[in-house]
Each structure stands twice: as C-alpha cells, then as structure tokens.
Regions:
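N-terminal subdomain of nucleotide-sugar transferases
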Residues: 1-43, 88-90, 108, 112-123
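Short beta-strand segments
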Residues: 7, 36-38, 96-99, 129
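Short, solvent-exposed loop/turn segments at secondary-structure junctions
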Residues: 10-11, 41-44, 101-102, 131-134
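Short aromatic-enriched loop/helix-cap "lid" or pocket-rim segments at secondary-structure transitions
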Residues: 17-18, 45-50, 108-109, 137-142
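Metal-centered catalytic cores of metalloenzymes
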Residues: 21-26, 53-56, 132
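A conserved catalytic-core segment of Leloir-type glycosyltransferases
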Residues: 29-94, 141
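Acceptor-binding helix/loop patch of EC 2.4 sugar-transfer enzymes
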Residues: 60-66, 128-147
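Short N-terminal targeting/anchoring amphipathic segment
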Residues: 84-104, 123-128
Length: 147
C-alpha cells in the first residue's frame, strides 16, 4: 500500500512528529511505500518525491508580516494546491493526517476528497488526534471558568 503521512512538522520536534515517524518506519518495515507532506523547512528529515511543501508561517515576524495569517490558519489555498501535487504523483491508498492545524488547515481534507472523486481512487483518510486544537482553539478544553 502507498501511505501519505501528513503532519505540519516533518522533522523531529515533539510527540506528534515522533509518533508520525515511528508509524512511517513501521509501515515501511512491513513493505508499504510511505511519503510525507508538511511544511517546508530546512530541518525536514523526510518528505515526498515531488518536493511539494507548504510555506512555513513565521509568527515571530510580527503583525505586519502576518496580516493574512488569521485567514491562512483557517483555510489555506496553498496547502490545498501543494497536497494536490503530491496526491497526483504518489496516488496514495491511505492519507493519514496528524497535526494539520494552523499551517496546513482542514482545507487539505477538501482537496483529498476532490482528488478522490476526480480520480475515482478509493483512498481512505485516517486522522489521529494529538491534542484538542481542531475542536478548541485554546487547546485546553476549558470552560469560561477555566475548569
């Protein structure tokens, strides 16, 4: 099987990345072909054969440099376009999503579904939740009383 592992960071950074790399290694050891999609970064240790990655938003650059960031963290045209290049080339049987919030956005799910319909490919989508961010922007799942 061909499996596309998707995570915003595709270099060692934290728990989600460790998990993603361990899953990729295990899948390869069992004879599956694995490629990765995420942010463009010089630290990337894995990737895809077409070199299609999303431009990293550097939030440390201040407000002026990131005026469109509030929109890009909800919906990313660039991420949709870049994942389509990988889908067309790799033709995965499974797309396994991990941390996609802020940089990649759920917009990539729309592109995966569009690609599946257009190609009639029976590609499965799997999503592993590593935190609450997609359902609670503050990550903590606190109520108004911070409980």
């Amino acid at each position: 099987m061909r499996i596309l592992l998707v995570n915003k960071f595709i270099f060692p950074k934290g728990g989600a990345e460790t998990y993603t790399f361990d899953v990729g290694k295990m899948l390869e050891e069992h004879g599956h072909e694995v490629q990765y999609f995420g942010l463009e970064n010089e630290k990337n240790t894995v990737g895809n054969r077409v070199g299609s990655y999303v431009t990293n938003m550097d939030f440390s650059q201040g407000i002026k440099a990131n005026l469109n960031a509030p929109f890009r963290i909800i919906y990313s045209r660039e991420a949709r376009k870049k994942i389509r290049v990988v889908l067309d080339d790799f033709q995965p049987d499974v797309v396994h999503l991990n941390n996609i919030q802020y940089h990649l956005t759920p917009s990539i799910i729309l592109e995966i579904n569009k690609w599946r319909k257009e190609t009639k490919k029976e590609c499965k989508i799997v999503y592993t939740t590593h935190d609450y961010q997609l359902v609670c922007p503050s990550h903590g799942m606190f109520d108004v009383n911070m409980k």
